Amino acid sequence: MDVILDILKFSVSGILFFLATFFVLKNLLDNREKERRHQMRIETGKILTPIKLTAYERLVLFLERIKPESMVVRIQYPAMKAGDLHLMYIQQVREEFEHNVSQQIYVSEDLWRFVIAAKESLLQFINTCSESVPNDVPAVELSKILIEKYNETENPPIDIALVVLKNEIKTLA
């Protein structure tokens, strides 16, 4: 009977020692893993933050470049007709968007939705304005209408997208 008690004492103390060692080592390894993940997040942030800022800059440029007053200055030619200008505006907005479509992986889904909404709204706006002008009149007539009506618009989608973009940039700091 003493032998069984001795075996039980050693077994129980061995099991307790094993369990204590196991939990201490598990805790130590878990802490090291948490620290490693934390360091990886810091390193990833150091790499991604400049890339994200570049994406935000490019989206600001995109939104500013597709504003009617900006496109009028860049695109209009002296002998151009309104119908040709209409097509060039549409083409320019689409090209600018396609050039910046990859930026969506660096910004929030909400911001990207605002950018798309701004683009789509502008395309619709350009089409609507061009319907009010005959295709064969000088392009300057369409340009005037675009700028006048755009300036009359309360909270243009491009401006809303820019506000959302700027607010998202502030969350990076």
Question: How would you describe each model-predicted region?
Answer:
Residues 5, 9, 14, 18-22, ...:
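Conserved non-transmembrane functional hotspots
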Residues 1-3:
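N-terminal hydrophobic targeting signals that begin at the initiator methionine
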